[in-house]
């Protein structure tokens, strides 16, 4: 009897088939056990292949990975924990995590992130902890980045290149409890006022509040951003500097000068118009007087009767 027809061979084929379906193969040099895959300190430059499809916890930290492929990640529909810290990931594209909507924990800290697309986290409605700290080239966060992460409770933004942030981006984070903001070059100008007010009224925990300070302007350098609300409000809403008064004075003078010139031009135009009217009426009067004089002569001749003719000599 051949191996292909025996019961043991059928069992082997069935086991192999189940293995392919469940994706039980483990990536080279990684450690796989109990739905957990650890590919740590392996100097990987790419996302590893052959990750089991039933993986729930994936550790890719301390490698040289430059990007996260949405297609391969999308097969891990049961993934709840993803650690990618200390890699070389440069950007997170729209819908990178579209297939792992059950994700609860995401760590992208200590990478080379320069941008995060507005819809990068759009499907991560179950995300509870997000760490994107220590990305010094990350200068900007779109206000829609956190629009759908409504379950987020922990957010770490330490030591990035962020210097300004839109307070509207935090309106959807209604359950956010802990926010780290230190180590960023915050520019505390009037555009920053709304965010400082949000920090005060949201009652979030800021464990590093004393180290989250302003770098500009000079008069607010070193101020904790959680305490800079009142000085900013004074500077931006109720306070006028000497330069502001000079500017207002110049505006007032320009308005006065423009009004004076406009009034003078109006007066000149009115005088010229009146003179033109008078000249026109004078000409009309002379024409009317001449007409009357001619009519009087004609009438006087009419009263004298018919004009006598001299007798004809021949």
UniProtKB/Swiss-Prot annotation:
Compartment(s) where it occurs, according to its Swiss-Prot or TrEMBL record: Cell membrane
Coiled-coil ranges from the UniProt annotation: none
Disruption phenotype: Knockout Kcnu1 male mice exhibit severely impaired fertility. Activation of Kcnu1 currents in sperm lacking Lrrc52 requires more positive voltages and higher pH than for wild-type sperm.
Segments forming domain LRRNT: 24-53
Sugar-modified residues: 112, 131, 148, 189, 211
GO biological process terms held by the UniProt record: establishment of localization in cell; potassium ion transport
Extracellular side: 24-244
All copies of domain LRRCT, residue ranges: 184-238
Gene Ontology MF terms: potassium channel activator activity; potassium channel activity; transmembrane transporter binding; voltage-gated potassium channel activity
Domain remark text: The transmembrane domain is necessary for interaction with KCNMA1.
Pfam family, one: LRR_8
Disulfide topology: 26-32, 30-39, 188-214, 190-236
CC terms in the record's Gene Ontology section: plasma membrane; voltage-gated potassium channel complex
Organism: Mus musculus
Modification comment: N-glycosylated.
Principal location listed in the UniProt entry: membrane
PROSITE patterns (UniProt xref): LRR
Its job: Auxiliary protein of the large-conductance, voltage and calcium-activated potassium channel (BK alpha). Modulates gating properties by producing a marked shift in the BK channel's voltage dependence of activation in the hyperpolarizing direction, and in the absence of calcium. KCNU1 channel auxiliary protein. Modulates KCNU1 gating properties, shifting KCNU1 gating to more negative potentials at a given pH.
Cytoplasmic topology ranges: 266-314
Stretches forming LRR repeats: 54-73, 78-99, 102-123, 126-148, 151-172
Tissue expression as described in the entry: Testis-specific (at protein level). At the mRNA level, also detected in kidney, ventricle, spinal cord and skeletal muscle, although at lower levels compared to testis. Expression in testis at the protein level requires the presence of KCNU1.
Protein name per Swiss-Prot or TrEMBL: Leucine-rich repeat-containing protein 52
Subunit structure: Interacts with KCNMA1. Interacts with KCNU1; this interaction may be required for LRRC52 stability and changes the channel gating properties.
Transmembrane segments: 245-265
């Amino acid at each position: 009897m051949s191996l292909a027809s025996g019961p043991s061979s059928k069992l082997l084929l069935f086991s192999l088939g189940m293995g392919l379906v469940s994706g039980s193969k483990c990536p080279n040099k990684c450690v796989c056990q109990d739905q957990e895959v650890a590919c740590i300190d392996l100097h990987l430059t790419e996302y590893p292949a052959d990750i089991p499809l039933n993986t729930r916890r994936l550790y890719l930290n301390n490698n040289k990975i430059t990007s996260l492929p949405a297609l391969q990640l999308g097969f891990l529909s049961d993934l709840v924990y993803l650690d990618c810290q200390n890699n070389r990931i440069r950007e997170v594209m729209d819908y990178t995590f579209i297939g792992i909507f059950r994700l609860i924990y995401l760590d992208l800290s200590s990478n080379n992130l320069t941008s995060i697309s507005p819809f990068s986290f759009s499907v991560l409605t179950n995300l509870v902890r997000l760490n994107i700290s220590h990305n010094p080239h990350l200068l900007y966060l779109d206000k829609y980045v956190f629009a759908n992460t409504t379950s987020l409770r922990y957010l770490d933004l330490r030591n990035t290149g962020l210097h300004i942030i839109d307070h509207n981006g935090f309106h959807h984070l209604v359950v956010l409890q802990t926010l780290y903001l230190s180590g960023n070059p915050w520019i505390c100008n009037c555009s920053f006022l709304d965010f400082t007010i949000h920090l005060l009224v949201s009652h979030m925990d800021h464990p590093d509040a004393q180290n989250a300070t302003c770098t500009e302007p000079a008069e607010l350098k070193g101020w904790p951003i959680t305490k800079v609300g009142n000085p900013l409000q004074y500077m931006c809403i109720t306070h006028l500097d000497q330069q502001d008064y000079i500017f207002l004075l110049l505006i007032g003078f320009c308005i006065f000068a423009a009004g004076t010139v406009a009034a003078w031009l109006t007066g000149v135009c009115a005088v010229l118009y009146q003179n033109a009217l008078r000249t026109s009426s004078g000409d009309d009067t002379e024409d009317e007087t001449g007409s009357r004089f001619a009519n009087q002569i004609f009438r006087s001749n009419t009263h004298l009767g018919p004009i006598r003719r001299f007798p004809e000599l021949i």
